[in-house]
From Swiss-Prot:
GO MF assignments: adenine phosphoribosyltransferase activity
Record's function text: Catalyzes a salvage reaction resulting in the formation of AMP, that is energically less costly than de novo synthesis.
Name of the protein this chain belongs to: Adenine phosphoribosyltransferase
Coiled coil regions in record: none
Subcellular compartments: Cytoplasm
Keyword Repeat set for record: no
Upper lineage: Bacteria, Pseudomonadati, Spirochaetota, Spirochaetia, Spirochaetales
PROSITE patterns: PUR_PYR_PR_TRANSFER
Species of the source: Borreliella afzelii (strain PKo) (Borrelia afzelii)
Gene that this sequence comes from: apt
Assembly with partners or alone: Homodimer.
InterPro entries (UniProt xref): Ade_phspho_trans, Adenine_PRTase, PRibTrfase_dom, PRTase-like
Keywords assigned by UniProt, alphabetized: Cytoplasm, Glycosyltransferase, Purine salvage, Transferase
Amino acid sequence: MKNKTEYYDQFIAKVPNFPKKGILFYDITSVLLKPEVYTSLINEVYSFYNLKKIDCIAVVESRGYLIGAPLSLKMQLPLVLIRKEGKLPREVFGEEYELEYGFGRIEVHKDDVRMYSNILLIDDILATGGTLKSSAILLERAGGRVKNIFCFIELCGINGRRILEGYKVNSLVRYD
């Protein structure tokens, strides 16, 4: 996937000391304010993944939904939601994860993932890789196969790709 940092950087707000001191938060919600930019993002991802063998798209709460939901419609694929603990009403698989700034637990409905389905996993940002690694483990435990991972932004200096070794990881925006 081509590096599009130069184009998208102007539309990504950088918020220092959020959610806690010492963290620089990359806010992609400003991309949503420009429909032409948001459309461009979805079209870029669609163009890259459209011809790959993908059976469903799984998205990480909550900003992963912003990319995955329109993409699943465009690709005519089922959308599987990965949520924070306690937000799903049916039987779930759960997995612990570590964030850049804390810990948490994610869940997926046990019956949302088809056995042996090829999954494109999407989140907005790749930092430590902890959330995505836990999401991939969760989906695989539910019977799926995570074939590809896409993140809009990748913080290369943190090197989250290291713990995602074995997965095909792509991003459009890369910051050192």
